[in-house]
Amino acid sequence: MSGKVLLLVGGGHAHVAVLADWIRRGPPGAGVRTVLLTPERHLRYSGMVPGWLAGQHAQGEGLVDLAALAARAGVDWVQGRCIALDPVGRSVTTDSGAILSFDCASLDSGGVGQGAALLGNDPRLLDVRPIEGFVKRIAAMPPPRRVVVAGGGAGGVELAFALRNLAGADPRPEVTLATGAAGLLPGFAEAVRSQVATALVRQGIALHLADARLESGRMMTGASTLEPADLIIAALGSAAPDWVRESGLAVDDTGFALVDEHHRSVSHGHIFAAGDVSARADRPLVHSGVHAVFAGPVLAANLRSVLADEAPRATYHPRRHSLYLINTGDGRAIASYGRLSAEGALVLALKHWIDKRWIRQYAKLAGTA
């Protein structure tokens, strides 16, 4: 496939692993041009955002310089956002109107927020997606006095803890966590849910195990009001971008690009996808940065194979259990691994070490360390 173009759409966790592979092992074949399309110069590591809110990190920490990483990998960086994909015509249209042609493409642009769709519209509503927009808005606003966090997954729980311990806020914000009907940390072991519930009580965070909604300008769960609230955070998971559903790629019932165990589109063999923009056709797989990180090297290997006119061979088989480290914002964290759990300052130290090691490896490769 020499003289051809590989287009990497999005700068998510999987694609930074592809860039790292290009740096370590060299570009994938003579004459192959790789282009990276991202709306932002930096990838913000979302796992460090709660720590930043709680004053444990600086705002500038947790960033991977995608442009610098691309330059070191021999990849052309184009700033822009994909708004349309034509897999048959092999082109992408960006938000500036530019059309980028490709021979092979990989999608790792993430999902989109669904706060307004699930809760309703309100000027106080702030979705965690896209994460960079979330960080910029939080950084620019005065400390809120009363916050409602909608979403009972690990992301929503961490944000509730972080906002209760918001750096520079005096008095500390009053925080309410509305988990949704699925409850607190669905899919996690009972021991972990119990430890998190205890920590919520200890920190004075109100817990509502019900769906939240905006009704006539008021935040509600059932017949109960969650008002007053200065800020409403939507941590409700990601929806598929419209352009994926409209592209003609095979998608699941919710519009995510269907891929096989090689992370190759089941309908268009020259398209690959990973992260929140994709869904596995062979098995259910929750959208999590953990899976995107581990899928990255698999994606890199398979892109190399396809660019060498070979069949993809590498497969991603998710581990039975994943390690989750939930920052409680007060100098501690709660670890979850299957049925096992632990809590304390040492768990937080482990989280910081893992997070900073991940960032540091890409900073070194990009030459920005």
Residue positions per predicted region:
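FAD-binding core/adjacent interface of flavoenzyme oxidoreductases
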Residues: 2-7, 72-146, 168, 220-222, ...
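Beta1-alpha1 glycine-rich phosphate/pyrophosphate-binding loop at the start
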Residues: 2-75, 157-188
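Short glycine-rich anion-binding loops that position phosphate/pyrophosphate groups of nucleotides
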Residues: 14, 110-113, 238-240, 331
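A Rossmann-like FAD-binding core segment of flavoenzymes
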Residues: 77-85, 100, 168-261
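Short, well-ordered coil/turn residues at beta-beta hairpins
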Residues: 95, 108-109, 209, 235-236, ...
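FAD-site-proximal beta/loop scaffold in flavoenzymes
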Residues: 123-144, 226-294, 301
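A conserved FAD-binding loop/helix module that cradles the flavin
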Residues: 277-329
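C-terminal auxiliary extensions adjacent to catalytic cores
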Residues: 330-369
